Amino acid sequence: SDLQIQNILSHRIAFISISGKNKISSYKTNINEAQWVAHISAIIYHRITKKESFVPEKHLGIITPYRSQIATIKKELGNTGIIELLSVTIDTVERFQGGQRDVMIFSCCVNAPFQLQFLCNTFKENGQLIDRKLNVALTRAREQMIVIGNSHWLERDTIYRQLIEYIKDKGAFFQI
């Protein structure tokens, strides 16, 4: 509901857990996540355009690990009917390095546990476990970060579990 989305957008960082059956045409796409990305993008667009012109390079960016999910998200953004959203950069974490946006949406697109190996890039530094890809994804957001994914699978990874627990403690975890 729009009220739920307003609540989601009131947090600096939020996690939307998409559970249930994904209409899987491939493990590298998640239509439910793509639809949520598009819906939230449209609401963010309308919020911004009440105050100023929408500038995609400044206001909004979308990160996802797979090219096929990029295409799925683009299709769903097109379905919103908001032409400006088609100019929003949607790319992989690696290709988004160096670019920041006011709001970043991260579609994790993990449909099975084996995909965590591809999503995660962990190493130890000074006794601390660090995920380079997640770190880059989180630091692209100037004002707000929205993570969309299946928490059931993501929580199998130590760092994602810690992130989800942190977000739950902030009251910004939403089960859809």
Write out the residue ranges for each language-model feature:
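Conserved SF2 helicase motif VI
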Residues: 117-145
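Helicase-core coupling region on the C-terminal RecA-like lobe
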Residues: 1-43, 99-101, 136-142, 146-176
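A short beta-strand element within the Helicase C-terminal
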Residues: 91, 99-111, 116-121, 144-147
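Short, glycine-/Ser/Thr-/acidic-enriched flexible segments
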Residues: 20-21, 67-69, 95, 110-112, ...
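Conserved helicase motor "Helicase C" RecA-like lobe of SF1/SF2 P-loop NTPases
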Residues: 43-90
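Amphipathic coiled-coil/heptad-repeat helices and related helical stalk/stem segments
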Residues: 33, 89, 130-133
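Short secondary-structure boundary/capping segments
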Residues: 76-81, 107, 118-124, 154-155, ...
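Short acidic low-complexity segments
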Residues: 2-3, 89-96
